[in-house]
Amino acid sequence: MPNAPPADPLAWRPLRAPSLEEMEVVAGEIFRRLPANFRAMCEDLVIQVDDFPTEEVLDLLGIESEFDLLGFFQGVGLPFRSESAAVQMPNMIWLYRRPILDYWAEHEEALGAIIVHVLVHEIGHHFGLSDEDMEAIEAQQSDQDGKR
């Protein structure tokens, strides 16, 4: 039975949630595995991992619980960019480690699959993609991972 808990309860000790740094590495690797044409459109996009969203972000979105937001796109999406606009901060995607881990603990999805979903969804906001487009990218990613 491969999913059975270890016979020794102390065997759980080395199991732990990924740190901020480890989750950044995972997010970077997931990004590198996304379809090349999709990644090519993400020039100058910064991916940042933090434990929780800031109070300002929660207030902006009208969200009460810091656990209700897994990721956030901050910047000007490509459909809304203007050549005449003043120089701005780079577009960023924030992944929120603790809410992602909480979601992971409550669902039967792999942590990597959750991060793929959040990352693709937030990048989708950057490009103004439809939900169907984002689902197709996730499916393509899943197919590629299945071939590895």
What is the predicted role of each segment?
Residues 1-114, 126, 130-136, 141-146:
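Active-site rim/adjacent substrate-binding subdomains
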Residues 118, 122-126:
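Catalytic glutamate of the conserved HExxH
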